[in-house]
């Protein structure tokens, strides 16, 4: 076969590839509210009224203000009447303030709660719809990280748009409209002129929004990609650490962030130019209005008060249109985010899970038939898996499927479960096509135990209950007893309530598999599908479970995928699959009797040859007859047992606090979310972030210049308008014309400055913000990857949460620090300019107005305090739901097989209830706090105007000065209020800063790259020794794994570890890789304590082949190259050839460039394992750690790969965890681990000779017994099988 199975790409970085996606178009705006119910419409109605009244209040206030100006102007000779009028209008101001108090409460509380209610329903519907999709949808369309991203980030975007931003939009549009109404009723000519320029503002706003929407869409895609890299890295953290891939993960993450960063720069420029253009048009419009207003006053068509009312109203209305732009940008983002969510919700699966159509059979006899089935996986339609496939499983009988890895055995199981429909042909149950049967009913009749025991991060009891949710405790315990799980469960501190951790990692593979079997038994199905059901069990457990399965199978139609003879010895029929069709079918005896002409017989001969070799070695030193394999029996054809046991999984060592109970205990959330951030800490964190941002000081300086000038423009603008007001009352028309012309030119100058400096402000502050975000995210990932393994074992550091934390914390920090500082600088400049002008013109009035500012500040700070308490743990509560959703999608086949969709959705719904309740109270308090602050503001206006009239009455000041001071300071007070309404962002930013620095400051228990350690020589001898090791996993110190364990692997020799499931074999491998530190004792390499070496450097001399082949979602080439980043193409092909992988890779349409899918789902288990072996071989390390390295391979591959491994391990120190004797027959030393220490140690022959009644001998006896039974079945058919081969 041609050697180039697709030209491989250049050397690897961990870039996660994915199928190209079409650009997503946003949904219609009204579609955002598709989950609103009656109460939501009521809330939105009240919220809209509140927002409308709130928005109208300012133009109404301006109308009163204009009337007051006229009172000043027309009553200058009658001070008593003037005081009376002013007092009346001051009371009107208080009424407006009270209206704002009530309306802002209604606006904020109703929109906030309605938004949370609607998005809660949307999240639930999304998960429901995602779980309702057929399996092919997850193969081709959606990754787990997409679901996590949608539920986390996209849903938050939609919520932001349909709550706060929509309230703001109605508020600003009400201001805009009411401003024009006030204008038209005051001076319609002036208002009409203004109306002529509004379309121009709208066009600019439209272009601005469209541009931001496109950029936002692209940015979200690149951030989603970055999040996927983080999630894959953390999920496979053991592989990343073992192969020293931390820097590669960081580089890949950095590359993905760079794309988002550049898009962020463009967004800043677009935002600045859009806002600048809006202000340019608005200011030019007012220049025109001032000139035209003067014309109308001179011609006695209006007076100064009405003219100024129109201008003020139009000014506020026009600015409100600009202020609505961020809301429009949020709508654009939300429409795109909603499109992604609704695409899943609206997607009709090809195979409808919840359809009520289809029949339910009265009784099931269990005849299963596949007739002329052709099938290709939707993700690879050009690769045919089944070709004119025919198979009949008689009712109540057991059929075993054997065949090479990738021959289609698991595909048959998938078709019977109706995860897929065949391309052509039929799958029948009792003569009925599966397509005509009700799907939920069909799956209720089928019990599935797959080779990958998928457990959820809940209790053992809840995991078993997935089989039948209405079962009682007695039935649960009985199922566990029959599955040989009861004995180990009751020894656990929490028994059946023990938490199994994310993906069941708290349990050994064998323990997980027994729980999966108990789950299937509880279902009591008519048809049983066993896909390598006992592959992850040690000899003793396998024998007990197999006996339980044998009892369980009686009277049920059973289809077994297996590679061990013991597993299939009692099958009524054996079907041999080859190249997508059944090449042989018959009983074991019939197939074996074909001899040389039969595929099955050849396979058994191959196995027997392996036994012969093992036995001849054993017989040289021991006359004692023994079974020749360390597993219960010999494999016939290896199938994917790849997920049978996590090679690195902790052995019942720490139990996650994750909890599927319906109540959420706030105390279980990370403390940093609940604690209030002390001001000192916050200030300290702020300065640290500022230092982190120091390379951008030039950009920050230029951005600040933009902010200062943009802020000052507002004060100048107010001054120009108040100056014109006094000019309007001047009787000298020539003077009026000259002054108005001067101020109009000044306004045109201000409009040009607004265009330039808005662009400057937003462009440069966005560069500062984007660089900070990228830097914070990179540092956070580096800090995450420096932590020791025990940190990753904690529930709050689960992969989806870390990905979300990197995304949200960095964003919140950027929001608070980058975006908001720009606004603060702008408003500070505004206040300074305004206060200076006020004090210069009339210091007494300025002093009174400035004196009431603290009241406003106090009111807003009160709101800030309440916001802290109520926003604290919302993110954590959502994180729990997000984790559950991610697990459900990752294990979607298990969820589907057990009809558990409704249960998962119920648990998810329960997780969303607490944040919903808290959001209600948060809205009440935030709304009231904001209302109080606004009321105080208007009360201060009333006080200021009353005092101004008092000053005029007593001759201390005149009308012209007081009105200028009042207007300039009124504008600055609005700026102060706007600054303080940013409090929620600073609270989020403060919490995020705490979270960021908590992560960055954490001192790892095991430093991976300590410069003070001893350098590792270029070549090691490779001697490994564990001396007097005591060990417990850090999270459960009360469960001791090892007690005074001592082991030694001599340089260049092979040490095999055997023992019952859960005895700590894989813990030895974890200690050698220094994932954990022993409680006492030492792990030595070449006679030196491993702690003295640089950890990353020593790991470069160790290669691992885990039983669970963890692959990254990239190409085959890059997965192999992950073993050695400098490997050449020739070395990669050589490693693949040695691992028996080159042939199947070359046969794929894209060869080495084939995308393997998330966690390698596009490949069979055997194929994944061979790639994992190639990855280890390309490393050329002195120490090889093989954890069931060949367990997932078929007989032919196993033999060639075992030879390759023997050859590769030659001269290298090898530590092998194995169940099969063929894997360890040549081991120099076999160590039997039991009860936390080495119970027996020596070569195979030594153990049998010196410990005839020992544990190892008993295991051999057990295998001998089962194997003899199998051989007994074949002896009638073939004289070539020797008796002593058993």
Curated annotation (Swiss-Prot):
Residues annotated to bind brassinolide: 286, 941, 978
Q: Where is this region: Interaction with FKBP42/TWD1?
A: 1049-1286
**Catalytic activities:** (indol-3-yl)acetate(in) + ATP + H2O = (indol-3-yl)acetate(out) + ADP + phosphate + H(+); brassinolide(in) + ATP + H2O = brassinolide(out) + ADP + phosphate + H(+); 24-epi-brassinolide(in) + ATP + H2O = 24-epi-brassinolide(out) + ADP + phosphate + H(+); 24-epi-castasterone(in) + ATP + H2O = 24-epi-castasterone(out) + ADP + phosphate + H(+)
Q: What does the UniProt record say this protein does?
A: Brassinosteroid exporter that, in conjunction with ABCB19, supports the accumulation of exogenous brassinosteroids (BR) in the apoplast, thus promoting BR signaling initiation involving the specific receptor BRI1 and required for plant growth and stress responses. Auxin efflux transporter that acts as a negative regulator of light signaling to promote hypocotyl elongation. May contribute to the regulation of leaf position and morphology during PHOT1-mediated blue light responses involving auxin distribution, especially in low light fluence.
Q: Record-annotated residues binding ATP 1? A: 139, 377, 379-380, 408-411
Q: Which family does it belong to?
A: Belongs to the ABC transporter superfamily. ABCB family. Multidrug resistance exporter (TC 3.A.1.201) subfamily.
Full protein name: ABC transporter B family member 1
State what changing residue 319 to A does: Reduced brassinolide-triggered ATPase activity
Question: What results from changing residue 978 to A?
Answer: Normal brassinolide-triggered ATPase activity
Q: Which residues form a coiled coil?
A: none
Membrane topology, from the record? Multi-pass membrane protein
Region (Disordered) residue ranges read 614-647
Q: Name one GO molecular function term.
A: auxin efflux transmembrane transporter activity
By its UniProt entry, which SMART domains does this protein fall under? AAA
Residues binding ATP 2: 793, 1033, 1036, 1064-1066
**What's the name of its gene?**
ABCB1
């Amino acid at each position: 076969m041609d050697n180039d199975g697709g030209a491989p790409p250049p050397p690897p970085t961990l870039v996660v590839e994915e199928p190209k996606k079409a650009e997503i178009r946003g949904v219609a705006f009204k579609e955002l509210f598709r989950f609103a119910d009656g109460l939501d419409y009521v809330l939105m109605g009240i919220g809209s009224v509140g927002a409308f009244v709130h928005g109208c209040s300012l133009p109404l206030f301006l109308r009163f203000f204009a009337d007051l100006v006229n009172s000043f102007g027309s009553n200058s000779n009658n001070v008593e009447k003037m005081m009376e009028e002013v007092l009346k209008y001051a009371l009107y101001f208080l009424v407006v303030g009270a209206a704002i108090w009530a309306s802002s409460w209604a606006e904020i509380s109703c929109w906030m709660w309605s938004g949370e209610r609607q998005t809660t329903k949307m999240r639930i519907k999304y998960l429901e719809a995602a779980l309702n999709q057929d399996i092919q949808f997850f193969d081709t369309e959606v990754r787990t990280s997409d679901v996590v991203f949608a539920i986390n980030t996209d849903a938050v975007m939609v919520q932001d748009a349909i709550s706060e931003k929509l309230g703001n939009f109605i508020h600003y549009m009400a201001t805009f409209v009411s401003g024009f109404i006030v204008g038209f009723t005051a001076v319609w000519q002036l208002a009409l002129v203004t109306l002529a320029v509004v379309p121009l503002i709208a066009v600019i706003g439209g272009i601005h929004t469209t541009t931001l929407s496109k950029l936002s869409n692209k940015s979200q895609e690149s951030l989603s990609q970055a999040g996927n890299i983080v999630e894959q890295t953390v999920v496979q953290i053991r592989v990343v650490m073992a192969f020293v891939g931390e820097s590669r993960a960081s580089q890949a993450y950095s590359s993905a962030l760079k794309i988002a960063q550049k898009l962020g720069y463009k967004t800043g420029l677009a935002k600045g130019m859009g806002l600048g253009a809006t202000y340019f048009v608005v200011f030019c419009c007012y220049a025109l209005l001032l000139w035209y207003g003067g014309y109308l006053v001179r011609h006695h068509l209006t007076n100064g008060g009405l003219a100024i009312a129109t201008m003020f109203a139009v000014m506020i209305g026009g600015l409100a249109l600009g202020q609505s732009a961020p809301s429009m940008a949020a709508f654009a983002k939300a429409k795109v985010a909603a499109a992604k969510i609704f695409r899943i919700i609206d997607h009709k699966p090809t195979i409808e899970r919840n359809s009520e159509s289809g029949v339910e059979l009265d009784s099931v006899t269990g005849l299963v038939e596949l007739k002329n089935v052709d099938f290709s996986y939707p993700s690879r339609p050009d690769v045919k898996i089944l070709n004119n496939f025919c198979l009949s499983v008689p009712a109540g009988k057991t059929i075993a499927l054997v065949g090479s890895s990738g021959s289609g055995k698991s595909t048959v199981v998938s078709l019977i479960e109706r995860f897929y429909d065949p391309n052509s042909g039929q799958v029948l149950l009792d003569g009925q096509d599966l397509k005509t049967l009700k799907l939920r009913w069909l799956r209720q009749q089928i019990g599935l135990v797959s080779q990958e025991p998928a457990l959820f991060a809940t209790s053992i009891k809840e995991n078993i209950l997935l089989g039948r949710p209405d079962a009682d405790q007695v039935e649960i315990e009985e199922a566990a007893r029959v599955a040989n799980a009861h004995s180990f469960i009751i020894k656990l501190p929490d028994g059946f309530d023990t938490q199994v951790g994310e993906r069941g990692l708290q349990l050994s593979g064998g323990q997980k598999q027994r729980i999966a079997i108990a789950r299937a038994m509880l279902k009591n199905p008519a048809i049983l599908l066993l896909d390598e059901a006992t592959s992850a069990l040690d000899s003793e457990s396998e024998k007990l479970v197999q006996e339980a399965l044998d009892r369980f199978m009686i009277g049920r139609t059973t289809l077994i995928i297996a590679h061990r003879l013991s597993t299939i010895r009692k099958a009524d029929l054996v079907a041999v699959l080859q190249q997508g069709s059944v090449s042989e079918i018959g009983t074991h005896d019939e197939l074996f009797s074909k001899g040389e002409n039969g595929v099955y017989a050849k396979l058994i001969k191959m196995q027997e040859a392996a036994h012969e070799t093992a036995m001849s070695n054993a017989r040289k030193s021991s006359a004692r007859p023994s079974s020749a394999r360390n597993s219960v029996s010999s494999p016939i054809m290896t199938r994917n047992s790849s997920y049978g046991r996590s090679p690195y999984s902790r052995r019942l060592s720490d139990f996650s606090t994750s909890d599927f109970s319906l109540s959420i205990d706030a105390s279980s959330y990370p403390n940093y979310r609940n604690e209030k951030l002390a001001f000192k800490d916050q200030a300290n964190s702020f300065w640290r972030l500022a230092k982190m941002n120091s390379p951008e000081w030039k950009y920050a300086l230029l951005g600040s210049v933009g902010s200062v000038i943009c802020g000052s423009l507002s004060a100048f603008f107010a001054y120009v308008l108040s100056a014109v007001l006094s000019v309007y009352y001047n009787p000298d028309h020539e003077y009026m014309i000259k002054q108005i012309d001067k101020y109009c030119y000044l306004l045109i100058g201000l409009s040009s400055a607004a265009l330039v400096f808005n662009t400057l402000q937003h462009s440069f502050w966005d560069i500062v913000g984007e660089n900070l975000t990228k830097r914070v995210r990179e540092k956070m990932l580096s800090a995450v990857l420096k932590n020791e393994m025990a940190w990753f074992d904690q529930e709050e550091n689960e992969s989806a949460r870390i990905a979300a934390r990197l995304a949200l914390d960095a964003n919140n920090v950027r929001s608070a620090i980058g975006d908001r500082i720009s606004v603060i600088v702008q408003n500070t400049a505004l206040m300074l300019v305004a206060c200076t002008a006020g004090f210069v013109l009339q210091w007494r009035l300025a002093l009174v107005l400035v004196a009431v500012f603290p009241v406003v500040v106090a009111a807003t700070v009160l709101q800030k305090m309440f916001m802290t308490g109520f926003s604290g743990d919302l993110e954590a509560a959502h994180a729990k739901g997000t984790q559950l959703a991610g697990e459900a999608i990752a294990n979607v086949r298990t969820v589907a097989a057990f009809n558990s969709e409704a249960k998962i959705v119920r648990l998810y719904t329960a997780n969303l209830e607490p944040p919903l309740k808290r959001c209600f109270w948060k809205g009440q308090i935030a709304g009231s706090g904001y209302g109080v602050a606004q009321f105080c503001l208007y009360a201060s206006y009333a006080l200021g105007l009353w005092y101004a009239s008092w000053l005029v009455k007593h001759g201390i000041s005149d009308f012209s000065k007081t009105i200028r001071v009042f207007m300039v300071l009124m504008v600055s007070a609005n700026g102060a209020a706007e600054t303080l309404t940013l409090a929620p962002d600073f609270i989020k930013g403060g919490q995020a800063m705490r979270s960021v620095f908590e992560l960055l400051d954490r001192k790892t228990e095991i430093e991976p790259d300590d410069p003070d350690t001893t350098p590792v020589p270029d070549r090691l001898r490779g001697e490994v020794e564990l001396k007097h090791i005591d060990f417990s996993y850090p999270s459960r110190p009360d469960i001791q794994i090892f007690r005074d364990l001592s082991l030694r692997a001599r340089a260049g020799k092979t040490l095999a570890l055997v023992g019952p499931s859960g005895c700590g074999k894989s813990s030895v491998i974890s200690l050698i890789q220094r994932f954990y530190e022993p409680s006492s004792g030492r792990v030595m390499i070449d006679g030196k304590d491993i702690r003295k070496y640089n950890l990353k450097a020593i790991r470069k001399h160790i290669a691992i082949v885990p039983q669970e082949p963890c692959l990254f979602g990239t190409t085959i080439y890059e997965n192999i190259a992950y073993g050695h980043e400098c490997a050449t193409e020739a070395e990669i092909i050589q490693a693949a050839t040695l691992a028996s992988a080159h042939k199947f890779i070359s046969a794929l349409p894209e060869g080495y460039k084939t995308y393997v899918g998330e966690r390698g789902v596009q490949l069979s288990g055997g194929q994944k394992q061979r790639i994992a072996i190639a990855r280890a071989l390309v490393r050329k390390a002195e120490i090889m750690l093989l954890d069931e390295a060949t367990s997932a391979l078929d007989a032919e591959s196993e033999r060639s790969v075992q030879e390759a491994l023997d050859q590769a391990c030659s001269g290298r120190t090898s530590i092998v965890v194995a169940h099969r004797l063929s894997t360890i027959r040549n081991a120099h030393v076999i160590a039997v681990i039991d009860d936390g220490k080495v119970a027996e140690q020596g070569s195979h022959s030594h153990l049998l000779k010196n410990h005839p009644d020992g544990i190892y001998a008993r295991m051999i006896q057990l295998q001998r017994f089962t194997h003899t039974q199998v051989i007994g079945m074949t002896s009638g058919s073939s004289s070539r099988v020797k008796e002593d081969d058993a």
